Amino acid sequence: MIFMKELFLFLHVVLATFWVGGMLFLSLVVAPYLKDKPQIRNEAFQEVGKRFSLYGTFLSLFLLFVTGLVNTYLIQGGFRPSIHTKLGVFFVVVFISLLHDLWAGKKALYSEKHRVWAKWLGILNLILSLLLVYLGVRIRLGY
């Protein structure tokens, strides 16, 4: 049983690292690099966004949900108020991710309004995702 706990916690941490790390990479490396390249910026964001959306949004968020539920029972022994809070924030992140990827991001190539929406939805999503990491640390420490 201890191996299962370690395995699912490990998977959860790796998936969270991929999700949050990907957003940090996009905002701290890709965005500043493309800022001075308006001729390729929008198309590059579209291409990078499509790839990250598939693995980051759809695959990793789904697997984070599954591993989070498994960890809730294997490690925490069930739901506690702090886990309810994390789950609530998680669902907000999923909603914002879908709004970003399926609405604003897709239209950002052709619309300045949607580009601005995509930018701010991405920033909000990053902030809330960092909050999820913080809540995860608190839960793991027993709060």
Curated annotation (Swiss-Prot):
InterPro entries referenced in this protein's UniProt entry, alphabetically: TMEM205-like (IPR025423)
GO CC aspect terms: plasma membrane
TM regions (residue ranges): 7-29, 52-74, 87-105, 120-142
UniProt keyword annotations, A-Z: Cell membrane, Membrane, Transmembrane, Transmembrane helix
Topology within the bilayer: Multi-pass membrane protein
UniProt subcellular location: Cell membrane
Listed name of the protein: Uncharacterized protein aq_363
Organism: Aquifex aeolicus (strain VF5)
Phylogenetic placement of the source organism: Bacteria, Pseudomonadati, Aquificota, Aquificia, Aquificales
